[in-house]
Amino acid sequence: MVFLCLHRCISSTKICQILIFSIYSRRIYLIQIDTKNMNEDLDDVVILSAVRTPIGSLRGSLSVLKAHQLGAVAIRGAVTKLNGSISVDDINEVIMGQVLSANEGQNPARQAARSGGLPYSVPATTINMVSGSGLKAVILGAQAIRTGDANVIVVGGQECMSQAPHCLSLRHGKNLGDISLVD
């Protein structure tokens, strides 16, 4: 589960700071770019903060948590790593990818945003594009920033496969006998 705060690096500030978390080395890097010698039309989308939760196993210690609860932990962590350089009030939107949202309630991205400490004023969207859901959220966030619709967006993916429900086909009831659960 990777969460990113995306932000437009505007050349008028002359200095753009980027906070990057390396998943592999588990270290945080603050990169500062001097933009005064760069193209004045600089409108690159940069990653301000990135966080992931541990990868759990089926029915492991994280299995009791719903996906939006894991998402909330990561959102809070990504915002905390910004060390106040961007306020939660500066966040324009949350876009989260999630494949299995059954039994999660309505709009799991919104639940993660609220539980992650973001204000009610920040809208949230849940994307389902199967395995590409988290990456699609990143793409949509970057597009919104590049088109000028937003300046700061929290994007990522959340999932807890241990919470995936089993389904019974009971729309028309069931007579006596065995019934199969669908996984």
Predicted ranges, named:
Residues 3, 21-24, 29:
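Aromatic (phenylalanine/tyrosine) cluster motif
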Residues 90-97:
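Short glycine-rich phosphate-binding loop at a beta-alpha junction
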Residues 39-45, 57-88, 103-183:
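Acyl-thioester C-C bond-transforming condensing/cleaving domain
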Residues 51-55:
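Short polar catalytic/cofactor-binding loops
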